[in-house]
């Protein structure tokens, strides 16, 4: 097939690799514009743009996608289908309907669960044990189109959104190629989503990473895993931000007496922090504002205290 591909970050590159291996003709790659990144705020090109440039595939980076200009440019390339993977923009009807096979989306969840911009992060943060990828026929709603094909994937107890994303991306590439094969053969049966089962994976905000110690330790641990690497998990210690980098539910450690947020040294292991429901979180690695990352024990040694309160 002649494919016009719309995608921006590293997650989308696995789909490009799969399309290339399957012999599909990529007529263009559409990515978001280069953006400032890093401490120096130098312009950084999207991962998909780098992939395309290395192979001589034409790249488009429009600032606007709903003024008709992009639709006209793609229509001139006569693609058989649009493939969208983490592009990061909402597409209008003119784009969704310009190709004979419409627009197919590679989405990082088992729709209708986790519609929206951060499906991988929220699936982990909410403690789910299974997720997957969906190949969807796009419509004008937010991930509301008919499901064409799905593949499931287990979420491991130690998975973070960062470790899970590459596996989902690879699975998405495989599912995409299979869906295109079935589409060409006329063997795909679109399935309407059950809106009653939908959950929203809204865009993450910095404040989502703030730890509420009144939550059970398992819930705090899940959110730490889901929000790694951003926004991470953080609390405060005597008015300074304290990032919690590594932690797990401390089923085998005593819960410190007192209110949620009370922290106590567990010799040789880390800090046990009292959480909701009488549970404890064993914190092993942290970063105090203005300091490099360190073990939780080193933090306590530096403070010369065995017990202190977090969230203050």
UniProtKB/Swiss-Prot annotation:
InterPro entries: Fmt, Formyl_trans_C, Formyl_trans_C_sf, Formyl_transf_N, Formyl_transf_N_sf, Formyl_transferase-like_C_sf, GART_AS, Met-tRNA-FMT_C. GO terms for molecular function: methionyl-tRNA formyltransferase activity. GO terms for cellular component: cytosol. Its EC number is 2.1.2.9. SUPFAM superfamilies: FMT C-terminal domain-like, Formyltransferase. It comes from the Bacteria. Keywords: Protein biosynthesis, Transferase. (6S)-5,6,7,8-tetrahydrofolate binds at residues 109-112. It catalyses: L-methionyl-tRNA(fMet) + (6R)-10-formyltetrahydrofolate = N-formyl-L-methionyl-tRNA(fMet) + (6S)-5,6,7,8-tetrahydrofolate + H(+). The keyword Transmembrane helix does not apply. Coiled coil: none annotated. Attaches a formyl group to the free amino group of methionyl-tRNA(fMet). The formyl group appears to play a dual role in the initiator identity of N-formylmethionyl-tRNA by promoting its recognition by IF2 and preventing the misappropriation of this tRNA by the elongation apparatus. NCBIfam families: fmt. Belongs to the Fmt family. This is Methionyl-tRNA formyltransferase. It comes from Anaeromyxobacter dehalogenans (strain 2CP-1 / ATCC BAA-258). The lineage of its organism: Bacteria, Pseudomonadati, Myxococcota, Myxococcia, Myxococcales.
